[in-house]
Amino acid sequence: MKLLENKVAIVTGATRGIGKSIAEMFADQGATVIFTYVSSEDKAKLLESELLSKGVKAKGYKFNVADFEPCEGMVNDVVKEFGSVDVVVNNAGITRDTLLMRMSEEQWDEVINTNLKSVFNMTKAVQRTMLKQRSGSIINMSSVVGVKGNAGQANYAASKAGILGFTKSIALELGSRNIRCNAIAPVFIETEMTGALDEEMVQSWRDAIPLKRGGQPEDVANLALFLASDMSAYITGQTLNVDGGMLT
């Protein structure tokens, strides 16, 4: 039996990078995969086709998870169509990096709303269903930047640190109903976005990591799969770093 067979999973921000890798891995392990996106329709259609080709059910929803009502509406639709929500991966996120002296209110609000408010929105939306089921796994994508901070990323660091406190609080609130909530804190993950950066700078980041390489989206997806599955049934309220030993 596959690790996520008969489970319904929602992954936000899933058409590229870490989110895409998680959606693909969940499908490989038998999950029905529901995903959200805000940008490319073409990428979403390709992902949906790819997931369906794995022999599972899949569906994409286009909306901004920073908006509360669409999150509720989507979860209601998913429960009606697929019967449950067993796993949520709050992965959607953006950066608007700049020093505090140059940061606009808009840049602050945009990052906080997309990265942190969306986690509240989706968790609130699935709470009722998971409480009725007396089961569920909520996985929140934080960052090593949320653990240690980073110059030029005050907005991003605040949003990712907020996720850590939210995760612990939800684990305490919902644990008695067998609903688990954990956070993943990746460091330098090599994706399409990092591929556009200066290679010399990227190599300097790799050199600063004890394992001497950047992480791959699959490294994060492997942990998300573990946290989504029953293998992690006694793990909740934790922040698990995927950092190649950087914070050691």
Where are these regions (language model features)?
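Alpha-helical segment proximal to the catalytic Tyr-Lys
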Residues: R128, L172-S176, A233
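Substrate-binding pocket helix/loop in short-chain dehydrogenase/reductase
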Residues: L99-L100, S104-I112, T194, M201, ...
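C-terminal substrate-recognition "lid" of short-chain dehydrogenase/reductases
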Residues: I179, G214-V242, M246-L247
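Conserved glycine-rich cofactor-binding loop
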Residues: V8, T15-G17
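Active-site helix of classical SDR
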Residues: T123, S159, T167
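Residue(s) in the substrate-gating loop at a strand-loop-helix junction
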Residues: S143
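Conserved glycine-rich Rossmann-like NAD(P)H-binding loop of the short-chain dehydrogenase/reductase
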Residues: Q29-L46
